[in-house]
């Protein structure tokens, strides 16, 4: 009896801590929207504002429960699988499990289904989903080999991005360049809040079991590689796309969302999240039954964690759809009609704070701080991510205003990112490339993307959305590569400065001991 009371008390303590963290995450976005409602730039009605505030409270609850569930289930599941299968020393089994898991999780990812629905006029949605799943499975297969054989992530990424831009050039040459931005956006879409904690923990489990020098830096990089797979897959599919390449803006009005029954929205999201989780959970318990044989206590903890993850993610996604999508579109349309400079500055500011509300970002930051033993803190990570996302969204709206190709950002951006990777500690490079896939989560696709689409409809017209509005997710995924590696570059410079000062002091001390004879 006393033990059960202690367990309940510990649960409420953990949940309250997670809710406090999520409240701090959601408050900045909510505060900015409330301030914006007082300005003449956006007209937000009383009912819309109340809906938004209710959604914000639901967001706090959803993020808090999701983060608790990730700690209790998603992260341990990945680590146990990584450690158990690696310790068995059956390479074929480990690689096969990695490949199958990559395909299954990606096929079930709700965000990918949304993407497939948006491009079904130009390519088969089913074909897109399974091709992207195959791409992620193959890249996860490659990522596991990278950890096992300590392959340099920088070199691997350099070759992959060279191949990626070669295929992009072929796509432009074929006259289907309008699908380029959509292809790059797919990389951020497929690394969703369910898959990120699991895949990251899988990498940690494998790396810790393999051991050796640089085990901590070797554990990162799986998310980075899995983000490249979907881009390559969609680029290849786009080469064979047929039909009308025009894009129709969905109904983003508050009325279209408020007309749905609340239970209908929650029911739809429960189905999406359940579809994503069930494959992962079944696959884990099959592996557990065959190979892991975990204690009963740990299995019960994982089951409770899965429930918290499910409930938290359903609440989060429903809240986002109810208020954040229509509000983002409305802000984009109305602010850009007033003054393009205002919407560009607003995009930068909102980008700095919206990343705080991404569920998987908190999981990433906690794992980074733990793996690096505090060398890279959660605060440093959050500041670097916030700055990167803010810059990326501001630049995306600037691109919408002037109407130029996404490649003018991506080519120099990735050249800088890959160039920095040869000058900063490998740990920072691995963390940076993983962060790109994590930062571009559901808040980006459900709030920021509608905002940019709204701005594009006003500035360039609906027909230009496919060319200029899409690409914002790709930008959000790219800029953290530069900002986080800049942290590493700063640390390298600081070490060199300290070494130079220490050497100079030693030399000065030796000079003082020299005896001069007349």
List each language-model region with its residue ranges:
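Membrane-interfacial loop-to-helix junctions in multi-pass transporters
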Residues: 48-53, 85-94, 122-130, 170-175, ...
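Small-residue-rich segments of transmembrane alpha-helices in multi-pass membrane proteins
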Residues: 30-33, 62, 90-98, 159-171, ...
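Signature of multi-pass transmembrane helix bundles
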Residues: 1-68, 83-84, 88, 187, ...
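Hydrophobic alpha-helical transmembrane segments in multi-pass integral membrane proteins
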Residues: 170-178, 234-242, 316-323, 394-395, ...
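Helix-loop-helix junctions within the multi-pass membrane cores of secondary transporters/permeases
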Residues: 91-168, 344-421
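Flexible loop linkers connecting adjacent transmembrane helices
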Residues: 71-90, 114-123, 152, 324-339, ...
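Structural signature of hydrophobic alpha-helical transmembrane segments
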Residues: 52-64, 123-135, 186-199, 269-281, ...
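Alpha-helical transmembrane segments
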Residues: 140, 144-151, 179-182, 204-218, ...
């Amino acid at each position: 009896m006393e033990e059960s009371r202690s367990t309940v008390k510990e649960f409420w303590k953990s949940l309250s801590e997670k809710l406090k963290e999520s409240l701090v995450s959601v408050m900045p976005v909510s505060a900015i929207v409330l301030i914006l409602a007082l300005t003449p730039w956006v007209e937000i009605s009383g009912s819309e504002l109340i809906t938004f505030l209710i959604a914000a409270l639901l967001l706090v609850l959803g993020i808090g429960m999701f983060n608790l569930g990730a700690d209790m289930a998603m992260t341990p599941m990945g680590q146990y699988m990584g450690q158990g299968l690696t310790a068995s020393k059956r390479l074929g089994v480990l690689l096969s499990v990695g490949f199958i898991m990559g395909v299954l999780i990606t096929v079930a990812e709700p965000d990918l289904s949304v993407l497939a629905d948006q491009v079904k006029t130009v390519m088969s949605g089913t074909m897109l989903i399974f091709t992207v799943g195959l791409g992620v499975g193959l890249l996860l297969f490659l990522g596991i080999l990278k950890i096992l054989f300590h392959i340099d992530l920088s070199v691997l990424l350099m070759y992959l991005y060279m191949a990626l831009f070669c295929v992009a050039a072929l796509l432009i040459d074929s006259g289907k360049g309008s699908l380029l931005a959509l292809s790059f956006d797919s990389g951020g879409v497929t690394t969703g809040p369910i898959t990120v904690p699991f895949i990251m923990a899988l990498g940690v489990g494998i790396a810790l079991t393999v051991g050796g020098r640089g085990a901590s830096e070797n554990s990162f990089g799986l998310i980075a590689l899995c983000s490249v797979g979907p881009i390559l897959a969609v680029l290849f599919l786009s080469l064979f796309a047929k039909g009308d390449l025009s894009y129709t803006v969905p109904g983003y009005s508050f009325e279209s969302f408020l007309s749905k029954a609340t239970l209908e929205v929650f029911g739809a999201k429960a189905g999406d999240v359940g579809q994503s989780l069930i494959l992962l959970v079944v696959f884990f318990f099959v592996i557990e039954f065959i190979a892991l044989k975990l204690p009963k206590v740990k299995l019960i903890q994982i089951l409770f964690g899965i429930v918290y993850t499910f409930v938290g993610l359903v609440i989060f996604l429903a809240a986002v759809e109810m208020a954040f999508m229509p509000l983002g579109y409305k802000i984009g349309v109305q602010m850009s009609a007033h003054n393009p400079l205002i919407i560009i500055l607003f995009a930068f500011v909102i980008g700095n704070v919206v990343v705080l509300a991404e569920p998987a970002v908190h999981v990433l930051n906690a794992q980074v701080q733990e793996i690096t033993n505090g060398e890279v803190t959660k605060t440093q990570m959050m500041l670097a991510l916030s700055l990167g996302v803010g810059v990326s969204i501001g630049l995306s709206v600037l691109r919408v205003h002037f109407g130029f190709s996404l490649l003018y950002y991506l080519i120099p951006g990735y050249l800088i990112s890959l160039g920095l990777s040869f000058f900063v500690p490998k740990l920072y490079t691995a963390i940076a490339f993983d962060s790109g896939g994590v930062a571009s989560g559901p808040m980006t696709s459900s709030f920021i993307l509608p905002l940019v689409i709204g701005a594009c409809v006003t500035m360039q017209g609906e027909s230009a959305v496919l060319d200029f509005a899409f690409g914002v997710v790709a930008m959000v995924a790219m800029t953290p590569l530069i900002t986080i590696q800049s942290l590493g570059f700063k640390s390298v410079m600081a070490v060199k400065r300290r070494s130079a000062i220490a050497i100079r002091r030693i030399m000065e001390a030796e000079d003082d001991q020299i005896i001069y004879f007349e």
